[in-house]
């Protein structure tokens, strides 16, 4: 997304308070615990600590807890939201990042309790209020899920 040849400085780490300043999500739907690195207009690396105390593990699945794929994608989307809001200087403005499309999603390995899920998201392009991203979730160096999605930056719906 960067339109100049200037070197953009990395931001990070960012704690959960800074994440919450960029996102409207709260427990139990806040799925980004911290940001390790954010390069405005380019990429973000964030972390979701997946614990057995996650509410979704109660029913998904009893005796064999696995993080639902849709929530892995949601965690990636939230990381993208932080990237977009921080990159555009919109933190604290109340602007929201809404999903518009999810494409090319693949789930490679299950996400179980007790791991740190690494969320890597890159800007592919931005035009006006529309942003496209490429993302992947990793467990150590193994890809658990990958996807591309489109989102829109807008004011909250009333």
Swiss-Prot record:
EC code(s) of this entry: 4.2.1.59
GO biological process: fatty acid biosynthetic process; lipid A biosynthetic process
Active site: 60
Superkingdom, natural source: Bacteria
GO CC annotation: cytoplasm; membrane
Subcellular location: Cytoplasm
UniProt keyword Lipid metabolism present: yes
First-listed, main subcellular location of the protein, grouped into a coarse class: cytoplasm
Reaction catalysed by this enzyme: a (3R)-hydroxyacyl-[ACP] = a (2E)-enoyl-[ACP] + H2O
Pfam families reported in the protein's UniProt record: FabA (PF07977)
First-tier enzyme category under EC: lyase
GO molecular function: (3R)-hydroxyacyl-[acyl-carrier-protein] dehydratase activity
Keywords of the record: Cytoplasm, Lipid A biosynthesis, Lipid biosynthesis, Lipid metabolism, Lyase
PANTHER family in alphabetical order: 3-HYDROXYACYL-[ACYL-CARRIER-PROTEIN] DEHYDRATASE
Family listed: Belongs to the thioester dehydratase family. FabZ subfamily.
The protein's role, per its UniProt record: Involved in unsaturated fatty acids biosynthesis. Catalyzes the dehydration of short chain beta-hydroxyacyl-ACPs and long chain saturated and unsaturated beta-hydroxyacyl-ACPs.
Protein name in UniProt: 3-hydroxyacyl-[acyl-carrier-protein] dehydratase FabZ
Gene: fabZ
């Amino acid at each position: 997304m960067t339109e100049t040849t200037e070197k953009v400085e990395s931001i990070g780490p960012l704690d959960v308070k800074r994440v919450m300043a960029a996102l409207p999500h709260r427990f139990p739907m806040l799925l980004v615990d911290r940001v390790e690195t954010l390069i405005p207009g380019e990429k973000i690396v964030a972390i979701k600590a997946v614990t057995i105390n996650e509410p979704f593990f109660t029913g998904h699945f009893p005796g064999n807890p696995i993080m639902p794929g849709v929530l892995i994608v949601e965690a990636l989307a939230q990381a993208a939201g932080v990237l977009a809001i921080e990159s555009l200087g919109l933190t604290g403005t109340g602007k929201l990042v809404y999903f518009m499309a999810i494409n090319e999603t693949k789930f490679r390995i299950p996400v179980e309790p007790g791991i740190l899920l690494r969320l890597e998201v890159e800007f592919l392009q931005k035009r006006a209020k529309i942003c496209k991203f490429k993302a992947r979730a990793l467990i150590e160096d193994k890809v658990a899920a990958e996807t591309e999605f489109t989102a829109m930056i807008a004011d909250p719906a009333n």
